[in-house]
Amino acid sequence: MADAPITHGGNLHEAALRYGIPRDAWLDLSTGINPHGFPVPPVPADAWRRLPEDDGVLAAHAARYYRAPGAAHVLPVAGSQAAIRALPALFARGTVGVAPLAYSEYAPAFARHGHSGAPLDCGADTLPAALTYAIVANPNNPTAERVDRTRLLRWHAQLVARGGALIVDEAFSDAESDAHASLAADTHRDGLVVLRSVGKFFGLAGVRAGFALAAPALLARLRDALGAWTVSGPARHAVLAAFADAAWQHAMRERLAHDGARLAALLRAHGFVTHATPLFSWSADPRAHALHDALAARGIWTRYFAHAPSVRIGLPAGDDDWRRLDRALAARVPTLAAAARRPFASDPQG
């Protein structure tokens, strides 16, 4: 399982080959990335020429933005994905709990380092005694499920008492209005790791920058595992500018709240029950593959989950894209009931 290829959203090259539609003709709604990205100011020439210096500035700004206990509790990384792959090697072998439908990199990252896996019930107050670790996204990708901080801290206490740890991936939390749901301020606690990403809310997935928040001793080991220069000079410039622009952040949260509600309402109007964050809607429906395939035939790419038939749809960027999605749904949804009864070849996405 650990060595199986993992497919993510945003794979337009694959979509173009499969459906015979040129790459630039696609409307890509397959990710939960903000389509209204932060306008990065011009990058200074030195950011390109010089090696990035670990002067603590980026960690200090991140600590203020995320409300972490301090800069010593923050490690800049090349996207939270880098930390997800590296962290399991720092823990003694055990059993990790992962939600049945979650980010597809979690379980393989732990399996790669000899850990076993078990399903995680995000509604449970008490974790199974067999679990040593748990990794949970809050809100979850793709189901949009949220776990309240009281339950998360209860889980953390249970796991630490067993010599384990809790990892909370808050990659999609920046767009949420309730900052108090974050555990970033609690990362002085041993056995707690919080992962944050600038790719989703700020729409800067291409800069590959994120942060691991934890006790300094664990971050020192993670720093050694990842090596030097994990975040490039241009990426540091972009992230610092994004953190400093509080007015943009406030306006964008309001815009995404509106757009996220609009997308959920549009899908409901076409007969799909949805669970949503401000950045995407998710629907578990027998017609999920038929919907994914029908939209793809019209050049609209979504994220289909084959092992738990469901589809995730991200935000359109502008009015033309909204109309294109609405027209495609109106044209194809009436045919989906029949299409859903026909067998489909296995889809590699998961």
Question: What is the predicted role of each segment?
Answer:
Residues 150, 297, 307-350:
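PLP-dependent enzyme catalytic core of the Aspartate aminotransferase-like
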